[in-house]
Amino acid sequence: MDIDIFEPVLTIGTVARKLNIAVQTIRMYEEEGLILAYKTETGRRMFSMHDLERLRCIRTMITEHGLNLSGIKKMMSLIPCWEFKGGFDEQCQKCPAYYEASGPCWTIKNVGPKCQNVDCRACPVYRIEVSCNKIKEVIFGHKSSENNKNQE
């Protein structure tokens, strides 16, 4: 049986205990747009294993690399979302996520046509592999076998 890492199965309290942080800290990260909580019909926040890894990475950026929330948001705003949504085109040029650097694309209001009516939690941009060690690859382009062959 495969585990769906995107399935929201962890409560906010469980995530807080696993990361040894306060529930309020997780809520603050959510308010800042660094994480997208799934909310049940009753408003209970739930998180996936993918969200847990994203939060671990955020904590690492803060505690080990000295970044603040603003710096993390700016860095996330550099993720080339169009690469995950079918490539750069005229629609992308009109999208505020392309020319704004205020935060990750899932925090932008009035997004372009490619992202209208899309559940951001299910979007490939939000679901990219979370790894603090690979953030440069995500921002500056995927490491591909073609690039490796060209360097040989």
Where are the predicted features?
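Arg/Lys-rich, alpha-helical DNA-contact motif
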Residues: 2-12, 17-18, 36-42, 49-152
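Short coil turns linking two alpha-helices in DNA-binding domains
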Residues: 22-25, 31
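Conserved active-site tyrosine of GNAT-family acetyltransferases
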Residues: 29, 47
